[in-house]
Amino acid sequence: MTFSATDATSGAGLQADVLTIASLNCNPLSIVTGVSVQDTIGVRGLTAINAELVNDQTRTILGDMEISAFKCGLLGSVENIRIIAEILEDYPEIPLIIDPVLASGRGDELVNEEMMKAMLELLFPKSYLITPNSHEARRLVSEGNENFEDLSIDL
């Protein structure tokens, strides 16, 4: 089950997750956390989906289907991060993979400091695997840390 915002170009976000999961012969279950306005040049806007709707989407599927893993991408809001953390409490045996999307590939900031703090406190401790790129890793740990070994220990 993947939690992420949409990307109408399918180059990232929920659509890319669905394509990737399907290419691995798995059934992609997708929870919309936000709707982006973007093209191949950059992100022009992002609207978070209401956390209650994220909760309802997720719990409806979890009541019907078994899943093998959770994957978090761009979550859209602190409220969405909180509700996803609450859902994960009910499924501690299911591994959580986090791709901490902090900015678009072109550098458009997508996560504020409050959202980053919520991810670090509420989701990272529950994670099985975290997949930041080097820029995300530096931002998550500390701006001045250039040692990748130290970054991996800190994360």
Regions found by a protein language model. Name each.
Residues M1-T2, V18-I98, L102-G105:
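Conserved N-terminal subdomain of the carbohydrate kinase-like
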Residues D7, D17, D99, N133-E136:
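Acidic active-site catalytic centers that drive phospho-/nucleotidyl reactions
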Residues L14:
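Active-site-proximal alpha-helical scaffold in enzymes
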Residues T47-E52, S104-F124:
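Conserved phosphate-binding/catalytic loop of the ribokinase/pfkB sugar-kinase fold
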Residues N112-L155:
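Conserved phosphate/ATP/ADP-binding segment of small-molecule kinases
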